[in-house]
Amino acid sequence: MNKALPADPADLVHGPLLRWAREHPDWPAIIQDAHGSHARQLDFGQLLAAVKERGAAPTGRPLGNNVLLTSTADPLALLIDFQAVIRTGRCAAVADPDWPTEVHARMEAALRDMGDQSPAPSPPPTPETPFYIGFTSGSTGLPKGFRRHHRSWAETFRITLETFGPVAGGRVLAPGRMS
């Protein structure tokens, strides 16, 4: 039997988090208000097992190999759910919580139609596996989706580090929502 080799973690979006968890477990990884997570907590082993078992993330709705995540009042929970989904080889679509019910329903239907409906678990992610579906604002009508694969973002991260050097590894302020 010919098994595919696992992907090089450096070619996956969550690869740097895995490395930091191993090399610098006590580094602050995510800080939100008075709450935070250290790098070691970004392993998500138990959460991943639960996600695989249920086929969805805690705040997500499974739609084939896509999972529609809705922004919650807790951005830290959304980031954890996002990481859990992409590590299972699925694609996380982040919905805008301000979408009207009918827009949300249309996005769910579109994601369901484009996803693999197989009940089998998704294979482990590869660099070419789609991991993220984002949406335009919808200012001209219905929001339009765009999909990114792991390699596209991993390459962006690599170029950022190459261009900006050590300062690219510093703290980042992300004041907006993921959607």
Question: Where would I find each of the regions flagged by the language model?
Answer:
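Short beta-strand->loop structural element characteristic of the AMP-binding/adenylate-forming
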Residues: 30, 48, 67-111, 145-147
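Conserved S/T- and glycine-rich ATP-binding loop of Class I adenylate-forming
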Residues: 68, 85, 136-139, 172, ...
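Conserved pre-ATP/AMP-binding loop-to-beta segment of ANL
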Residues: 6-14, 21-29, 118-135, 165-172
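Conserved AMP-binding/adenylate-forming core of the ANL superfamily
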Residues: 5-9, 13-18, 24-60, 103-104, ...
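Conserved AMP-binding A3 loop
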Residues: 43-44, 123, 131-158, 162
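Conserved AMP-binding loop of ANL adenylate-forming enzymes
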Residues: 70-73, 164-179
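Conserved helix-loop-beta element of the AMP-binding
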Residues: 64, 153, 171-173
